[in-house]
């Protein structure tokens, strides 16, 4: 049982997933701070000093904090858009690397092509 767990835990996909979750959590905190500490106050200034986190109403004895919900929606869209831009950038880098690999042929392959062409010429002369 221990060997199975060890092989599962050391498998590349599990480690990659764990690293992704940790980095994603840290990235989420950065974006949340960006939204809460920079963007929302600026948006509040543009809207006449409106503070979204203070928006609420009382229903019976419950306080409904819809301003915090609006702020969470803004966080979601900014995080989603940031991740989209990051993935798009990484995809372009991968595509560029793939094109560079195709553009630079392997020297051995070129040598083999030359040998093949020389053999064809010799065969055609005979």
Swiss-Prot record:
<keyword id="KW-0407">Ion channel</keyword>
<comment type="similarity">
    <text>Belongs to the MscL family.</text>
</comment>
<dbReference type="InterPro" id="IPR037673">
    <property type="entry name" value="MSC/AndL"/>
</dbReference>
<feature type="transmembrane region" description="Helical">
    <location>
        <begin position="67"/>
        <end position="87"/>
    </location>
</feature>
<dbReference type="GO" id="GO:0005886">
    <property type="term" value="C:plasma membrane"/>
</dbReference>
<feature type="transmembrane region" description="Helical">
    <location>
        <begin position="14"/>
        <end position="34"/>
    </location>
</feature>
<keyword id="KW-1133">Transmembrane helix</keyword>
<keyword id="KW-0813">Transport</keyword>
<dbReference type="InterPro" id="IPR001185">
    <property type="entry name" value="MS_channel"/>
</dbReference>
<dbReference type="InterPro" id="IPR036019">
    <property type="entry name" value="MscL_channel"/>
</dbReference>
<keyword id="KW-0812">Transmembrane</keyword>
<protein>
    <recommendedName>
        <fullName>Large-conductance mechanosensitive channel</fullName>
    </recommendedName>
</protein>
<dbReference type="Pfam" id="PF01741">
    <property type="entry name" value="MscL"/>
</dbReference>
<comment type="subunit">
    <text>Homopentamer.</text>
</comment>
<keyword id="KW-0406">Ion transport</keyword>
<comment type="function">
    <text>Channel that opens in response to stretch forces in the membrane lipid bilayer. May participate in the regulation of osmotic pressure changes within the cell.</text>
</comment>
<dbReference type="InterPro" id="IPR019823">
    <property type="entry name" value="Mechanosensitive_channel_CS"/>
</dbReference>
<keyword id="KW-1003">Cell membrane</keyword>
<dbReference type="GO" id="GO:0008381">
    <property type="term" value="F:mechanosensitive monoatomic ion channel activity"/>
</dbReference>
<keyword id="KW-0472">Membrane</keyword>
<feature type="transmembrane region" description="Helical">
    <location>
        <begin position="40"/>
        <end position="60"/>
    </location>
</feature>
């Amino acid at each position: 049982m221990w060997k199975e767990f060890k092989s599962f835990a050391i498998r590349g996909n599990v480690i990659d997933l764990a690293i992704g979750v940790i980095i994603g959590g840290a990235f989420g905190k950065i974006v949340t701070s960006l939204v809460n500490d920079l963007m929302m106050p600026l948006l509040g200034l543009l809207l006449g000093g409106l503070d979204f986190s203070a928006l609420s109403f009382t229903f019976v004895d419950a306080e409904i904090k819809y301003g915090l919900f609006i702020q969470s929606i803004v966080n979601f869209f900014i995080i989603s858009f940031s991740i989209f831009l990051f993935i798009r950038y990484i995809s372009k880098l991968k595509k560029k690397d793939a094109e560079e690999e195709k553009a630079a042929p392997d020297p051995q392959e070129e040598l083999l092509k030359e040998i093949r062409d020389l053999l064809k010429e010799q065969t055609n002369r005979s």
